[in-house]
Amino acid sequence: MKYFRADLHVHSRFSRATSGRLNIRNLAAWSMIKGLSVMSTGDFTHPAWRDELRRDLVYDDNSGLYRVREKTPLETEIPGFSRPDGVSEPQFLIQAEISSIYKKDGSVRKVHNEIGRAHV
């Protein structure tokens, strides 16, 4: 894949202010609606989320990324939507974030570092 669209800053449902319905199939469905080829998983350090990643994703030797083990039709996951023409199933990058929050000159500063990992 020469060019691709990706969302590399994602959180799992175990993070604050995220949907309780968020799971791998839901991320895959929304990525197809948005025309994304690669999604990150977010929060790979959370034990329950990591268990779901191991259960729901399978490693793709060709790309070095992961794909959904058991595909759910987009229409089933998100009623009222259908897969746009030419959009394929997304691949997943195992990812987490380190958020560094500090004060400087009386202002709060935040730096978000995204960490990718080869295997779950």
Where are these regions (language model features)?
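Generic start-of-chain signal for non-secretory N-termini
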Residues: 1-5, 9-11
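Extended substrate/RNA-proximal surfaces in nucleic-acid metabolism proteins
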Residues: 3, 49-119
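Divalent metal-dependent hydrolysis catalytic cores, especially in the metallo-beta-lactamase
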Residues: 29-49
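Acidic/histidine-rich helix-loop elements
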Residues: 12-20
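Active-site neighborhood of phospho(di)ester-bond hydrolases with catalytic His/Asp-centered motifs
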Residues: 7-8, 39-43, 93-95
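Histidine-centered divalent metal-coordination motifs
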Residues: 9-13, 118-119
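Short, acidic/polar
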Residues: 19-31, 103
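Catalytic metal-binding/acid-base residues of hydrolase active sites
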Residues: 11, 45, 97-99
